[in-house]
Amino acid sequence: MTAAIDVQGLVKRYGTKTVVDHVDLKLEPGRVCGFLGPNGSGKTTTLRMICGLLTPDGGSGTVLGQDLLTGRDAIKRQAGYMTQRFGLYEDLTIRENLEFVARLYGLPHFKDVVAEALTRLGLTERQNQLAGSLSGGWKQRLALAACVLHGPKLLLLDEPTAGVDPKARRSFWDEIHALAAQGITVLVSTHYMDEAERCHEIAYIAYGKLMARGSAADIIAQSGLKAMVATGEGADRLAQTLSSFPGITAAAAFGTTLHICSPDAQALKRAVASVSDRKSIRWQEATPTLEDVFIHLMGQAQDNMAVS
């Protein structure tokens, strides 16, 4: 089976700044890949190169069987790209927006195609509502409907649920997985850890470099991080003290508990020993979270930048 995305050594520069630095990415059809990283890490630029909107300064590969450099027009016809910001017309209704997009694609029987998209995304009852009056969640549903009108084989979604309430986010992700079940490949950037865990696989980028790739469980296991959790009176108040302890990569309070992690088991023991006089606090080993791993990876990326 031909990979939906198979690119190697992607590079993009703006002046002297390299914003995407030799990124390799391979994604099989029907998979949902979460694309994570801090703001300014190169996620949007990578998505735009993959869908043919930006020309790479280096690298090669194929997208949907088309050459990344010479087949950009063919890639655009088979891919759907959803931008971070709502890009449809707020003074048009939902139906008018979708019919406009369908006509741009030159779709035959476009009214039938629009009716199907309205039904699929639960927009039929709101079809005559102005897009500008929609809440964030409904705007994202409309944007997704516009992306799938032409029957794309690949969806590139750039932080599609930013600023959307939890219920709307869950509903949106249910639709993403329904599309993947039909064989559509989805590459979606997100900052939400719960969304990352719903992906078949994850790619983490920082400062333009791909730092980790695999399932959530694989990335956690490969990180080598160790974690401990403290409970008891005053545990949460130790976060500031232990966050600066040598070897500790993260110390975060969650309610009345404290979570610390490090790649060095001995550093964890020393950190715990340094507050052993707090008799009301109990410590136990824990499993690192994706958030722990990504904070650790971002620290590594910063260290690499400092060295270079």
Label the predicted regions:
Residues 51:
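Helix-to-loop junction immediately C-terminal to a conserved catalytic motif
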Residues 59-67, 75:
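Conserved ABC transporter NBD signature motif
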Residues 99, 103-126:
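Conserved ABC ATPase "signature" region
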